[in-house]
Amino acid sequence: MKKFSLIVAVCANGGIGIKGDLPWRLRQELKYFSRMTKKIQDSGKRNAIIMGRKTYFGVPESKRPLPERLNIILTRDPSANAYPSEVMVCTSMQEALKKLDEAPLVNEIENVWIVGGNAVYKEAMQSDRCHRIYLTEIKETFECDAFFPEITSDFQLVKNDDDVPEDIQEENGIQYQYRIYEKVPK
């Protein structure tokens, strides 16, 4: 059973989105998201990203599905929207994880990333398979209508990976910092 990690950018008021979009424009932070969710050790494999329907359709049409990763969309009504053949549509997180544990995907996927939105993050954080949260802490408040769930004491802040900068980043006058939380084994 593969563990998974979450990746998210959160502003000072806990916000992660507004009207299906990001409230900020941080090109380097988006590059970090792309690099982290594509990073593999085995060149014969790729990563999977799991997201809710609204998160998927929040990605500009020209950029979806997100390249070089298996895009898995969670939706209660798979027939309500048309999806490209290269994405996998599941009705639950449980179904998606089950498919990732079975052939052929178990041999093709290296890492699994949860990329939003709120309900998907919340369910993922409660799972025993949740390993880490890669959180970009944006040091400013933005108007948001979607929020990241509270990080409970089940998670502790850990040292950043070698390829994750520890110092404060700044872009377009907005400061942010990369943090990693790891789930404490029970």
Swiss-Prot record:
GO terms for biological process: dihydrofolate metabolic process; folic acid metabolic process; one-carbon metabolic process; tetrahydrofolate biosynthetic process. InterPro entries: DHFR, DHFR-like_dom_sf, DHFR_CS, DHFR_dom. Keywords: NADP, One-carbon metabolism, Oxidoreductase. Substrate binds at residues 29-34, 69. Its EC number is 1.5.1.3. It catalyses: (6S)-5,6,7,8-tetrahydrofolate + NADP(+) = 7,8-dihydrofolate + NADPH + H(+). Transmembrane segments: none annotated. GO terms for molecular function: dihydrofolate reductase activity; NADP binding. GO terms for cellular component: mitochondrion. NADP(+) binds at residues 9, 15-21, 53-55, 75-77, 116-123. It is an enzyme of class 1 (oxidoreductase). Residues 3-183 form the DHFR domain. Key enzyme in folate metabolism. Catalyzes an essential reaction for de novo glycine and purine synthesis, and for DNA precursor synthesis. Belongs to the dihydrofolate reductase family. This is Dihydrofolate reductase. The gene is DHFR.
